[in-house]
Amino acid sequence: MTTQHSKTDVILIGGGIMSATLGTLLKELSPEKNIKVFEKLAQPGEESSNVWNNAGTGHSALCELNYTKEGKDGTVDCSKAIKINEQYQISKQFWAYLVKTGQLDNPDRFIQAVPHMSFVIGEDNVAFIKSRVATLKKSILFEKMKLSQDEEEMKSWVPLMIEGRKSDEPIALTYDETGTDVNFGALTAKLFDNLEQRGVGIQYKQNVLDIKKQKSGVWLVKVKDLETNETTTYESDFVFIGAGGASLPLLQKTGIKQSKHIGGFPVSGLFLRCTNQEVIDRHHAKVYGKAAVGAPPMSVPHLDTRFVDGKRSLLFGPFAGFSPKFLKTGSHMDLIKSVKPNNIVTMLSAGIKEMSLTKYLVSQLMLSNDERMDDLRVFFPNAKNEDWEVITAGQRVQVIKDTEDSKGNLQFGTEVITSDDGTLAALLGASPGASTAVDIMFDVLQRCYRDEFKGWEPKIKEMVPSFGYRLTDHEDLYHKINEEVTKYLQVK
């Protein structure tokens, strides 16, 4: 059964952190706008934003070695690390503003201070990390980072990683107390609760069937209620597709030229989760290692303290898996259905180029539990098999697209796609994703609300005082803002 059209100003597809962030920003900047949200599942934040479906790292390049590139001459390029840290500073400022204005309460339910650390083994890697720290510390954003090779100091930071270590190879650790663990699922739920109180219509168990633009310029979005089987067509001036792995198939339905020659490659993740509370309580850090030579960036191993509903947990991974699904709750036909006449060459080109990724995935799929435990023991030498269980994390769909230089290039970041007229936007890709949600949504607003954005800037600077500045170039502003963030988010 189909009901009549329903008109709205904004439609947000997907009940994750991206839609929650964009909806919250729009309600602050243009409260008169009528906003509707459609989510396929029964509650918000259950796919990529779910606490067990992502690493929960507040990505700020304090520990992630893949954000700093080493040159042949031994110098380290930290520009990407600084950019990602700046983006996360924007997220923290916005969350602090929402706490300050009473729109978010109990920040400890979604963010915790957890030190971020890097861990390397071997002379070459130790030399790299020393150069990395020396370069990063030139920026105020990394002023508190410490580097150590002293056994006692390292043991005071992460005893489980030092006890039982027998190798003669040199190791080094960095330590930054300003790191965080974020439960993006809990944050998403809080943001949507606040939006509902402000009159935003959030509908669950809703499957978006089609998105088509009319000659009048408005978008028609056909939505099926999964409980009643009724189909409703909604008219909207603006549509945002923030549906995680489902964003690509939905973008393809729009028919905009930006949806052509673009594909997606799904990668699933497995983690080892500790079941021994005594072990869990002895580790308090997010420790990132260095990806093996030839391995993709998403393979960086890390030993992670997590907080879920106030309880401490410990994870190690990721180990890559493969499923053709684009969502954890998706269909095994997702990958096949995403192949279109306009992107088949793009997809095949990527397949030929990315043989190393294919080889890596095959090797990961062949791992036994004992082999996974051996990988863990590189970090935690005394780890016992009986203290760990395997869990399946979320699906990530890596973007494949053509560039000016060549076809079929695999992208490892987060990508915003917008229509020429700015009436539709979609978010594709993976890490750093959720951590940079606020900055990414500012980009969406700038590209899609060009005429209104200038008038919004005073309010934006009230919410995010560093907007328009690079904090790395403004030490006094950084310290002033950091005091406010620390006060309201209760982090370091």
Swiss-Prot record:
GO terms of biological process kind: tricarboxylic acid cycle
Protein name according to UniProt: Probable malate:quinone oxidoreductase 1
Required cofactor names: FAD
E.C. designation(s): 1.1.5.4
Keywords, ordered alphabetically: FAD, Flavoprotein, Oxidoreductase, Tricarboxylic acid cycle
Organism for this UniProt entry: Staphylococcus aureus (strain COL)
Gene3D superfamilies: D-Amino Acid Oxidase, subunit A, domain 2 (3.30.9.10), FAD/NAD(P)-binding domain (3.50.50.60)
UniProt family annotation: Belongs to the MQO family.
Keyword field contains Coiled coil: no
A Pfam cross-reference name: Mqo
Domain of life from the UniProt record: Bacteria
Tagged with keyword Membrane: no
Reaction equation(s) it catalyzes: (S)-malate + a quinone = a quinol + oxaloacetate
Pathway: Carbohydrate metabolism; tricarboxylic acid cycle; oxaloacetate from (S)-malate (quinone route): step 1/1
Name of the gene this protein is made from: mqo1
NCBIfam families recorded: mal_quin_oxido (TIGR01320), PRK05257.1-1 (NF003603), PRK05257.1-3 (NF003604), PRK05257.1-4 (NF003605), PRK05257.2-1 (NF003606), PRK05257.3-2 (NF003611), PRK13339.1 (NF009875)
Residues passing through the membrane, by range: none
GO MF annotations, alphabetized: 2-hydroxyglutarate dehydrogenase activity; L-malate dehydrogenase (quinone) activity
Enzyme class: oxidoreductase
